[in-house]
């Protein structure tokens, strides 16, 4: 699968600074903020800049910066505040001597803060040189879906006794071009057809323009040759929503005939708009995303001390494939979890003298979690050599553990979503039980991400990834939604950022599908609680 290039949202950043260090002698500094983003091995690249504000040490900038937001990426941003005495044309032309200070953080860190606002120190030469205040706002698209049902009344009979009608809806471009946005099914032998409900994103329906002209054509379907036009009509989304629901269908070829009125009526009913909530709205309302990690400790991984072993701590590569997977996925998700604790389990190894398919990786039943990604990696590196490897490779127990934890937070006002990261080297041996657990889990606020390390074919893993259809367990129960994403580590081992992108790209959609399925909207946005911003002490 190719990593998604479609952003989850577009966000707008606004800036203020407070109590900047003055670099000018006669007057005050002329601050301007330059934004750069870390992009791959090439390091930071310039994105955009604010305007320059003259003679002001606590400026509020008018120009906003718009960025695409990707949940699955760590979008590291650096905000550099410069004292600009002369106009520059290139980012590289900046004089380092004119730097007031800079601040580096991730876009996710800003977006997950209460009020989507952060106030931080500007640092230069290890000294605080002022404060920067960054506010983020999602650029609102329509975020709505349109629903409508259509009915034909008294349509012309194009066949011997009846017609086989269907309809098309086109939106009209400013240049007059008609773009097809919807085509209904064919209703056989019926001049008073009732078509199934139309449901689609408002942007796709009318481009977000409620007054854009819509052309509607009704045809009689013919299995051989061209379909026969019954009639056309024109309207707008606004008119339909205001209750103009019956439209005469006109056939241009018949308008010159004496006594011609129309070729039937097209009627719309049950027309409504429904707001589509965004991933960022759930974040703003305090929805937490917690990470649970399960590490494969089966014998097929090889010896921890062998260079060919998958748990071998290869320092030249940044650790084992397991450690790199944890660092890649965990570093993205950790920004969205307020308490910072990550549950860590092992499976397929010996625990307390017998093979266990779900045991605390700390080896202490009273300590199921570690703090932050660094804590998980420390626990992993400390204990992996202490665990006797065994087998087989069973997933059901760790999924059941995740189900139990996801079931703890199902109150609407305590919105929490769990991501279970399973890192494994082999094929599943309890496929039926695993599918049964995943079908059960599809009703819960839970996603399962599987990273396959090593050289196995992972055929069963691809079956679990519901991209090719819903999972069905051995009892015939169908998964309510797709919650599994499988990624082979070797495909992205040379690019850890790409691994995180591919691994996590479906999480926002899966979270939204869960809360939509239970009819729960985002909580109201949390309020940013301001703190007194005091000038730095005299140096």
Curated annotation (Swiss-Prot):
One Gene Ontology term, aspect cellular component: cytosol
Domain of life assignment: Eukaryota
Pfam families hit by this protein: C2, Copine
CDD domains according to UniProt: C2A_Copine, C2B_Copine
GO molecular function terms attached to this record: calcium-dependent phospholipid binding; metal ion binding; phosphatidylinositol-4-phosphate binding
Binding site for Ca(2+) 2: 23-24, 83, 85, 98
Residues in VWFA domain copies: 290-507
Keywords: Calcium, Metal-binding, Repeat
GO biological process, alphabetically ordered: cell-cell adhesion; cell-substrate adhesion; cellular response to calcium ion; negative regulation of gene expression; positive regulation of gene expression; sorocarp development
Named cofactor requirement(s): Ca(2+)
Binding site for Ca(2+) 1: 24, 30, 83, 85
C2 domain segment(s): 1-120, 128-251
Keyword field contains Repeat: yes
Keyword Repeat applies: yes
Disulfide bridge map: none
Sequence similarity: Belongs to the copine family.
Record-given protein name: Copine-C
Gene (UniProt): cpnC
């Amino acid at each position: 699968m190719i990593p998604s290039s479609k952003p989850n949202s577009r966000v707008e950043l606004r800036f203020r600074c407070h109590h900047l260090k003055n670099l000018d002698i006669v007057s005050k500094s002329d601050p301007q903020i330059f934004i750069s983003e870390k992009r791959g091995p090439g390091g930071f690249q310039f994105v955009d800049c604010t305007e320059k504000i003259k003679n002001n040490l606590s400026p509020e900038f008018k120009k906003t910066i718009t960025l695409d937001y990707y949940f699955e990426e760590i979008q590291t941003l650096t905000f550099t505040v410069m004292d600009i005495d002369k106009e520059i044309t290139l980012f590289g032309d900046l004089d380092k001597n004119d730097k007031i200070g800079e601040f580096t953080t991730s876009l996710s860190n800003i977006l997950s803060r209460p009020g989507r606002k952060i106030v931080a120190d500007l640092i230069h030469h290890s000294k605080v040189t002022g404060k920067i205040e960054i506010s983020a706002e999602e650029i609102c698209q329509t975020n709505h879906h349109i629903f409508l049902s259509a009915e034909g009344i008294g349509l012309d009979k194009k066949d011997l006794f009846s017609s086989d009608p269907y309809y098309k809806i086109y939106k009209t471009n400013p240049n007059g071009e008609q773009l097809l946005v919807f085509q209904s099914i064919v209703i056989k032998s019926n001049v008073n057809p009732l078509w199934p409900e139309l449901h689609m994103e408002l942007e796709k329906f009318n481009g977000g323009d409620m007054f854009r002209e819509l052309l509607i054509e009704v045809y009689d379907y013919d299995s051989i040759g061209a379909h026969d036009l019954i009639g056309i009509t024109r309207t707008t989304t606004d008119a339909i929503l205001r209750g103009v629901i019956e439209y005469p269908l006109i056939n241009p070829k018949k308008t010159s005939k004496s006594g011609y009125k129309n070729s039937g009526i097209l009627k719309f009913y049950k027309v409504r708009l429904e707001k589509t909530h965004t991933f960022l709205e759930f974040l703003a309302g305090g929805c937490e995303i917690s990470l649970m990690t399960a590490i494969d400790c089966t014998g097929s991984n090889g010896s921890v001390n062998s260079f060919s072993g998958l748990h071998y701590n290869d320092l030249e590569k940044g650790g084992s494939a397991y450690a790199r997977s944890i660092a890649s996925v965990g570093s993205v998700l950790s920004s969205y979890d307020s308490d910072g604790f990550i549950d860590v389990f092992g499976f397929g190894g010996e625990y307390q003298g017998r093979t266990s398919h779900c045991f605390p990786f700390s080896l202490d039943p009273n300590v199921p979690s570690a703090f932050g990604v660094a804590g998980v990696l420390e626990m992993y590196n400390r204990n992996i050599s202490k665990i006797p490897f065994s087998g087989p490779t069973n997933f059901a127990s760790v999924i059941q553990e995740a189900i139990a934890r996801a079931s703890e937070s199902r109150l609407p006002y305590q919105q929490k979503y769990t991501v279970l990261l399973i890192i494994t080297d082999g094929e599943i041996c309890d496929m039926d039980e695993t599918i049964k657990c995943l079908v059960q889990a599809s009703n819960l606020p839970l996603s399962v991400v599987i990273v396959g390390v090593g050289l196995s074919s992972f055929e069963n893993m691809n079956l679990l990834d519901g991209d090719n259809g819903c999972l069905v367990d051995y009892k015939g129960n169908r998964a309510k939604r797709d919650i599994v994403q499988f990624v082979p580590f070797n495909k992205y081992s040379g690019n850890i950022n790409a691994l995180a992108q591919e691994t996590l790209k479906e999480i926002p959609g899966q979270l939204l599908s869960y809360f939509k399925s239970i009819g729960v909207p985002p909580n109201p946005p949390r309020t940013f609680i301001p703190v007194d911003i005091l000038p730095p002490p005299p140096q």
